[in-house]
From Swiss-Prot:
This is Glutamate-1-semialdehyde 2,1-aminomutase. GO terms for molecular function: glutamate-1-semialdehyde 2,1-aminomutase activity; pyridoxal phosphate binding; transaminase activity. It is found in: Cytoplasm. The lineage of its organism: Bacteria, Bacillati, Actinomycetota, Actinomycetes, Micrococcales. Gene3D superfamilies: Aspartate Aminotransferase, domain 1, Type I PLP-dependent aspartate aminotransferase-like (Major domain). GO terms for biological process: protoporphyrinogen IX biosynthetic process. It is an enzyme of class 5 (isomerase). Its main location: cytoplasm. It comes from Clavibacter sepedonicus (Clavibacter michiganensis subsp. sepedonicus). Pfam families: Aminotran_3.
Length: 455
């Protein structure tokens, strides 16, 4: 028995399923989860001393790699001053200033820069950020209905688990038990990338719709970017009907571009360009905390000022703006310069090419989806129009992934334990770590090709 197996058995005695987040249980790939005990640079090490190239990277935050010395020192220095005060600290303002300044695209032809985040409220988790954004949208508009897209994951609050991605997709769940029908009925789910469905919903329910929430680029059902012009038209439909557009950048924010996916999608576009769009509210997580629990919601000042203590929409949190966590986030964002984003894109380019080569040589049918440095693969022949929505993602040959995953794991590469999750590279990936992944791919591709569907 491995030490990981022994530790996992102990965990199952006192923790439901042995994990504190379902996807970690290896439910869709089988086998025993590795108990990780150490991480540095592009590597993680398990309780048995086995080292892996990490393509999970804490599900997104570790864009610099693990245990970056400057981040570790910032955390140590902050902890030495106190783990928490229950009061506002200067670093919270610094982080809010950094985000409001960073989330911008340069003006075109002399027009001013576009800056959608005028004010920011810090929370501890992405779920809190999206939950609060929904409450704020309802409080600001005085309306009750919410529109979301099938396969988009916005955390595990009651309003947002309907036809969600991430662990809900991994476990093949329709949503979650424990959500009253009255709450579920306030969320309208439509197919992603389907503007006709959006227009139909607004035609029927427009005066009651508080907001449309969308992942800036879907990354929790695999990576599925919006079709060209989709989000811009979505914003127009929402605004024409007096509703708000909420862009969920918990996963994409500060990972795919210095200004998140909004920056990637709007860079170089004038404000009046047909494909330009500006959200009313944005949610952040992952990278903004540098690996510690920080998330945020931001947006238009007139909307944000409806939050207490200025307005009637209540939100609070004992650990919101925790000084140690904020120190990690501040330092990570300050270090995430153009060289970091260049390194992320290069690593993604190399790995995508290597996977495609291995899959082609193994005779696999597949599709690759990408948003900046985020990418994923689906097994099976894609439809002619490509992978554009939850239905096409779910139709893939998911049964090939466990064989692929375990072959990579056995060769020292840690991938997300679900075909519905993105691969995360880090700027710490060097020639040696990339080479280990590349050398592992041919055998893993052959294992996937040899897999058979369950009886």
């Amino acid at each position: 028995m491995t030490h990981s197996q022994d530790l996992f058995d102990r965990a199952r005695d006192v923790i439901p399923g042995g994990v504190n987040s379902p996807v970690r249980a290896f439910g869709s790939v089988g086998g025993t989860p590795r108990m990780m005990v150490r991480a540095a640079g592009p590597y993680v090490t398990d309780a048995d001393g086995v080292e892996y190239v990490d393509l999970v990277n804490s599900w997104g935050p570790a864009i610099l790699g693990h245990a970056r010395p400057e981040v570790v020192k910032a955390v140590q220095d902050a902890a030495a001053l106190g783990l928490g005060f229950g009061a506002t600290t200067p670093a919270e303002t610094e982080l809010a200033e950094l985000v409001t300044e960073r989330v911008r695209v340069a003006g075109v032809d002399g027009s001013p820069d576009r800056r959608p985040v005028e004010k920011l409220r810090l929370v501890s988790t992405g779920t809190e950020a999206t939950m609060t954004a929904i409450r704020l949208a309802r409080g600001f508009t005085g309306r009750d209905l919410l529109v979301k897209f099938a396969g988009h994951y916005h955390g595990h609050s009651d309003s947002l688990l309907a036809e969600a991605g991430s662990g809900v997709a991994t476990l093949a769940l329709p949503g979650s038990a424990g959500i009253p029908e009255a709450i579920a009925a306030q969320t309208i789910v439509v197919p992603y990338n389907d503007l006709g469905a959006v227009r139909a919903v607004f035609a029927e329910h427009g005066p009651r719709i508080a907001a449309v929430i969308t992942e800036a680029a879907a990354a929790n059902m695999g990576v599925v970017p919006p079709l060209p012009g989709f989000t811009a038209e979505l914003a127009r439909i929402a605004h024409d009907n007096g509703s708000l557009l909420i862009s969920d950048e918990v996963l994409t924010g500060f990972r795919v571009h210095p200004a998140g996916y909004w920056g990637l999608d709007n860079d170089g576009l004038a404000a009046d360009h047909p494909d330009a769009w500006t959200p009313d509210l944005v949610t952040y997580g992952k990278v903004i905390g540098g690996g510690l629990p920080v998330a945020a919601l931001g947006g238009r000042a007139d909307v944000m000022d409806h939050l207490a203590p200025l307005g009637p929409v209540y939100q609070a949190g004992t650990l919101s703006g925790n000084p140690v966590a904020v120190a990690a986030g501040l330092t990570t964002l300050r270090l995430a310069d153009a060289d970091v984003y260049r390194a992320l894109d290069i690593a993604a380019d190399i790995l995508i090419y290597a996977v495609e080569l291995a899959f082609d040589r193994a005779g696999l049918a597949y599709s690759v989806q990408r948003a900046g440095s985020l990418f994923s693969f689906t097994f099976g022949t894609p439809p002619e129009h490509g992978i554009t929505d939850y239905a096409t993602v779910q139709a893939q040959e998911t049964w090939r992934y466990p064989a692929f995953f375990h072959s990579m794991l056995d060769q020292g590469v840690s991938l997300p334990p679900s075909v519905f999750e993105a691969w995360f590279v880090s700027a710490a990936m060097d020639e040696a770590s990339l080479d280990r992944v590349i050398r592992a791919l041919p055998a893993a591709a052959r294992a996937a090709a040899a897999a058979t569907p369950p009886a």
